[in-house]
A protein has these predicted regions:
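Gly/Ala-rich beta-loop-alpha elbow adjacent to hydrolase catalytic centers
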Residues: 77, 92-100, 104, 108
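Short, electropositive, low-hydrophobicity segments enriched in small/polar residues
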Residues: 15-17, 100, 104, 113
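Alpha/beta catalytic cores of group-transfer enzymes, especially the acyltransferase/condensing modules
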Residues: 108-257
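Conserved S/T- and glycine-rich ATP-binding loop of Class I adenylate-forming
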Residues: 11, 100, 182
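Acyltransferase/transacylase module recognition
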Residues: 2-87, 232-266
Length: 266
C-alpha cells in the first residue's frame, strides 16, 4: 500500500557551499532534465546551471545571486521530485514558500519543466536586477522551539515604532514557522539590526535577498506579468497548496488558470 505524501518545495537560500556539485553527485543520470533548464539559460545568454553546479569553487557573489541561485535550486528540486518512487508514495499535494511556490507549480504539472525554468529564471533575474531592500530573520521561539509571546510582542512594538519613523520602511515579509522574516529598505535594515536582540546567529540578514513579499517590490509586478506568459500555465495533475491553505484547482480557461495562480500566490 502506498504512503500518502505532501511535497514541500524549497525556496531561496537552499543552494549553499555544501550543495555545490549536487546535480552531478545525485542526479547525473537526469541529463535530460538538466539540459531543459540549461536551455532556458542559454536562450537568455546566461551561464548554464550545469556549469555553475560543476564549478570547482563555490563563489557567493556568483552562486548566491538571484539570477543564478534560483534556477540552480529549481533544477535540484525538480530532480529530487522526479526521483520520488511513485510506486511507494502517492503525492496528494505540493506546496512551497516564496520561490518554492514556483517550484510547486512545476511539481504539480501546472507548469511543465521548461515553463517552470522560464518562470524561475525570469523572476530570479528580475529580483537580481531590480530588487530593492532586503530581509532579516529573527526567531520568535526559544531553543526548544517553543513560541515566546514576549518575542512576538517585541516585534509588534518594533513595527509600531518603525511606522513613526519617516525615513525607514519596514514590513513583515514572511511568518515562517518559528521565525519572523522582516523586509525593509536599506535604512530600515540598519535600524532593525541596531534594535533586534542579538545572539550568536540572529538577527540574520539574508544575503543577496531583496525585500520579498513587501510593497517595496510592487514595481516588479507589472514587469513580471508581462514577461511570464499565461500560455505556460496548464491544468496540472496534483493539487498545489498555498501557505494559506488555498488549493490550486483546474479552471475552465487559460486566463482563469493564470488568474487563479496569481491570486493564490498573493
Amino acid at each position: 500500500m502506498k504512503k500518502r505524501a505532501l511535497v514541500v518545495c524549497p525556496g531561496r537560500g537552499t543552494y549553499n557551499a555544501a550543495e555545490l556539485g549536487y546535480l552531478q553527485r545525485h542526479h547525473a543520470a537526469r541529463s535530460d532534465l538538466i539540459a531543459t533548464v540549461d536551455a532556458a539559460r542559454v536562450a537568455t545568454g546566461q551561464v548554464p546551471i550545469s556549469q555553475l553546479d560543476s564549478a570547482t569553487k563555490y563563489t557567493p557573489s556568483v552562486h548566491m545571486t538571484g539570477d543564478n541561485a534560483s534556477p540552480l535550486i529549481y533544477a535540484c528540486a525538480m530532480a529530487d521530485f522526479a526521483a520520488i518512487d511513485r510506486d511507494r508514495f502517492d503525492i496528494v499535494a505540493v506546496t512551497g514558500n516564496s520561490m518554492g511556490w514556483y517550484l510547486a507549480l512545476a511539481c504539480a504539472g501546472i507548469l511543465d519543466l521548461a515553463g517552470g525554468a522560464r518562470l524561475v529564471n525570469n523572476m530570479g533575474g528580475l529580483m537580481h536586477q531590480q530588487g530593492a531592500g532586503g530581509q532579516i530573520v529573527w526567531p520568535i521561539v526559544d531553543d526548544d522551539w517553543q513560541i515566546q509571546e514576549n518575542n512576538i510582542l517585541f516585534v509588534r512594538n518594533l513595527l509600531a515604532e518603525a511606522k513613526a519613523v519617516s525615513t525607514i520602511k519596514i514590513y513583515v515579509s514572511i511568518r515562517l514557522g518559528g521565525m519572523i522574516v522582516l523586509a525593509a529598505d536599506e535604512a530600515g535594515l540598519k535600524w532593525l539590526m541596531e534594535r533586534l536582540p542579538k545572539d550568536d546567529r540572529f538577527p540574520l540578514r539574508l544575503m543577496h535577498h531583496a525585500a520579498f513579499h513587501s510593497p517595496l517590490l510592487n514595481h516588479i509586478v507589472p514587469i513580471a506579468r508581462a514577461e511570464n506568459q499565461a500560455s505556460d500555465f496548464g491544468r496540472g495533475d496534483i493539487p498545489a497548496m498555498t501557505g494559506r491553505g488555498v488549493s490550486g484547482r483546474p479552471a475552465r480557461s487559460v486566463a482563469q488558470r493564470f488568474m487563479t495562480i496569481r491570486l493564490a500566490r498573493n
